[in-house]
Amino acid sequence: MGTPCHFALFELQPNFRLDLEQLATRYRELARGVHPDRFADASEREQRLALEKSASLNEAYQTLKNPPKRARYLLAMNGGEVPIEVTVHDPDFLMQQMQWREELEDLQDEADVAGVAVFKRRLKTAQDELNESFAACWNDAAQREQAERLMRRMQFLDKLTYEVRQLEERLDD
């Protein structure tokens, strides 16, 4: 996980719900202070430390601004690492995944730009619902299994959203 805690680095309390604008503002403030260019005339040791601090800051920011990564990080803070590869016993969601993938393939085959936009909005709604569900249960040890399941769903939707963006770019060409 690295030290210090990603949240402490940004002077935030560990929480799933974050003000992303506040996070970005704080990131820019901190990044200015450790940017390697500011240490161009410093000793080699100071340059290396600045580079390490900058890398740590970037990693923390990338983790906290991305809901699935933030969810995984919070779960790791609360009870140890979450296995990356596990057998998912979630037949309803597996079925939903298959339906979404088939629909995305159809949209690609048909080059349906308007359909992709509708699909993207539905994904965003599903992501928002997952985020709210996770926010409500991540800090409850009795709901750890549910929180992990939601985090895995969030990861899938994040990946699917990336694939939708790639499809949009191909259709725009």
From Swiss-Prot:
SMART domains: DnaJ. InterPro entries: DnaJ_domain, HscB, HscB_C_sf, HscB_oligo_C, J_dom_sf. GO terms for cellular component: iron-sulfur cluster transfer complex. The keyword Chaperone applies. Interacts with HscA and stimulates its ATPase activity. GO terms for molecular function: ATPase activator activity; protein-folding chaperone binding. CDD domains: DnaJ (cd06257). This is Co-chaperone protein HscB homolog. Co-chaperone involved in the maturation of iron-sulfur cluster-containing proteins. Seems to help targeting proteins to be folded toward HscA. It comes from Pseudomonas fluorescens (strain SBW25). Belongs to the HscB family. Keywords: Chaperone. Transmembrane segments: none annotated. Residues 5-77 form the J domain. One of its GO terms (biological process) is protein complex oligomerization.
